[in-house]
Amino acid sequence: TLVMLKFLDHDIPLPQAWTVTDLPDAAGLITLDENCRGELLELADVLTSNPLPILSLRPDDFDLTCCKSLMASVEEQLDRGPGFAIIDRLPLELLETHTATALYWLLASMIDRPVAQSWDGKMLYDVRDTGKQPGNGVRPDITRASQNLHTDNSYNLCPPDYVALLCINTAMKGGV
């Protein structure tokens, strides 16, 4: 049975509806405290020594008490704050990309169930400039092409409640 999505039929109040002048500079900013950082670095060592497929990782399989508390704060910002959160920050300088991605997967999974990022079912999608030219069959997120403001995964019959991004490398230019 296909469920029809309902269109918004009411105003959204602050803090979810805002303009840049409404927000303090630190809006949505959540600092990764030392306890959570320690849990993540300890888990990074475990995952490096015992490689597992990222998609098989579940937060409840690990002792991540401090990280679960941190992610509850993130969820609070998403649901009752400005609607976004920026975690400052994973210690990427100490992590291999695969391990950082695994930690990101686990943290995001504490908020909600991950969903496919593309029509072909990719659960993790790498946004990077591949040098391809935009056009038919080439997603703009693998090119240098600028994009309009958009909502990721809006094509999904059951779109996600949250979208999460892990920035491994800051772009030389562009972005926010």
Regions found by a protein language model. Name each.
Residues L2-V176:
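Non-heme Fe(II) oxygenase catalytic core, chiefly the N-lobe of the double-stranded beta-helix
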